[in-house]
Amino acid sequence: MKPQDLKVPFFWEERSTKIKDNVLYVPEHYFKHHQFIMPSWEEFFGNDNPISCELCSGNGDWVVAQAKETPEVNWIAVEKRFDRVRKIWSKMHNCRVTNLRIVCGDAQTFFLHYLGEAVVQRIIVNFPDPWPKSRHRKHRLFQDEFLNNVVRVLTEPGILILATDDKNYLLQAIQIMRQYLSPTMEDPYYCEVENYGNSWFETLWRSKGREIFYTEFVKKLGYS
């Protein structure tokens, strides 16, 4: 399968939520999410295996490799850009990975409208856009709304992982995660990590001599 074999299942003017070819399409600038009847994840995957969800999946190298190595886990790859979704989809088919589903859409919208309570065991955020300029900070993923949704969709105990090359972003994310979750590491709550997995961004940043930072938090039992 080639990336261009995946076609958008609607015209922009007629956009709506759809599932096709193991891709859930969550359109932007759309206000009828509540009208879509989302099948259970057991139906979508065909089993009730535990679910891990990667956000910012990029070209899909990392998540496809993880899904192939852990067939006992169901994987969800969330990526906003359709050109990247095509690449994930192509790799998924060419690697004959059957335990991966793709979400083409915004992570916040997906969490809010399409994930129920306590359905995901692990959420992995790989190299999110740090939006370094002060006037752009409102676009950062790690904010109260996102963490509220994370706590809602995670099982108990559930894990939230962040990998980034941007230390300032890491420290800001840790500060807000500590308000909702418990760190699994001792202060300063992060470490450098080797052999985290093969992703396009990790390869890029390591080739430029950057350090890769990793942090992990767990959902507090009884938090709601």
Curated annotation (Swiss-Prot):
What is the protein's given name?
tRNA (guanine-N(7)-)-methyltransferase
The molecular function GO annotations come to: tRNA (guanine(46)-N7)-methyltransferase activity
- Classification via HAMAP family: tRNA_methyltr_TrmB (MF_01057)
Q: Give UniProt keywords alphabetically.
A: Methyltransferase, S-adenosyl-L-methionine, Transferase, tRNA processing
Q: Which CDD domains match?
A: AdoMet_MTases (cd02440)
Which residues act catalytically here? 129
Which Enzyme Commission numbers does its entry carry? Answer: 2.1.1.33
For the ligand (substrate), the binding residues are 133, 165
Q: Name one Pfam family in it.
A: Methyltransf_4
Q: Name one GO cellular component term.
A: tRNA methyltransferase complex
Q: Does the keyword Transferase apply?
A: yes
The protein's annotated catalytic reaction(s) are: guanosine(46) in tRNA + S-adenosyl-L-methionine = N(7)-methylguanosine(46) in tRNA + S-adenosyl-L-homocysteine
What's this protein's function?
Catalyzes the formation of N(7)-methylguanine at position 46 (m7G46) in tRNA.
Instruction: Enumerate the residues binding S-adenosyl-L-methionine.
Output: 54, 79, 106, 129
Domain of life here?
Answer: Bacteria
Family per UniProt? Belongs to the class I-like SAM-binding methyltransferase superfamily. TrmB family.
Q: Quick one: which pathway?
A: tRNA modification; N(7)-methylguanine-tRNA biosynthesis
Q: Which PROSITE patterns match?
A: SAM_MT_TRMB
